[in-house]
Amino acid sequence: MAQQKQYNERIRNAVLEHLTSNANDTFLWVALVCQDLQATARRNVLKRLNLFPPGLDSLYGQMMQQISKSDDAELCKQVLASIALVYRPVTLEELVALVEQLEDIADDSELREIVGLCGSFLTLREQTIYFVHKSAKDFLLTRAAKEVFPSGIEDVHYIIFTRSLKILSRTMRRDMYGLTALGYPAEDVKQPDPDPLAASRYSCIYWIDHLCDSNLKSSTSYVSSLRDGGVINVFLREKYLYWLEGLSLCKGIPKGIISMAKLWSLVQACSRHTIY
């Protein structure tokens, strides 16, 4: 980095001293500081150095403060909240389906920019979003929970569930891959480009898990979702076979069977609480 940014000896020694003194033998801390300095003009490096506190949690807290002061603070927090709760890393397209405020951002470079604003917590590799380290996710779920989940973790799970059902209702249809023939061998199926399931692949497999983890049995919206004529009832009546087809194309039938069993258990549990 020193060569690339053409640091003089004074700046190079100051950076080395600060990294050595404050890293506490944590390579990730060094990597995050260097990532920030990479985007810092050489003339501002010495001033910037003093803003990096020692220790990972302190550094994450500092980065969280920077996000909170940005113009996109609320959007970044919603992205962080969603990424912290998904059950596997999601692609940019899948993230747009889960976060309503991203719907109007059609430009891929803008989406990358938003993920970049969360760069101390998130990284983007081949269109898929990952945490830089498990400690970043742990920080959001514990120390920063009140800021990232102001209405509670369960509420974000429920939002992801409703967004998932919305994208599935819009994309699930008969013969999505244009296979035409019944009983087409699964091993011969080739993913078309563009993929009709690109935005809904995650939701297809995990929507029921988010419903179960929302655990909002006293919520009016939760209750109405499970009632006869509610959004789940309507979805299963209108899209159930297409959803099974989607699961098959996602190679998610085994997970779908488990999810349906979880949904049935949830309905029974809610019935005992006089929902119906």
Name these PLM-found stretches:
Residues 2-11, 73-76:
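Short helix/loop segment immediately N-terminal to the Walker
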Residues 14-17, 21-276:
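Leucine/isoleucine-rich amphipathic helices and adjacent mixed helix/strand linkers
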Residues 1-2, 27:
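Aromatic-residue hotspot detector
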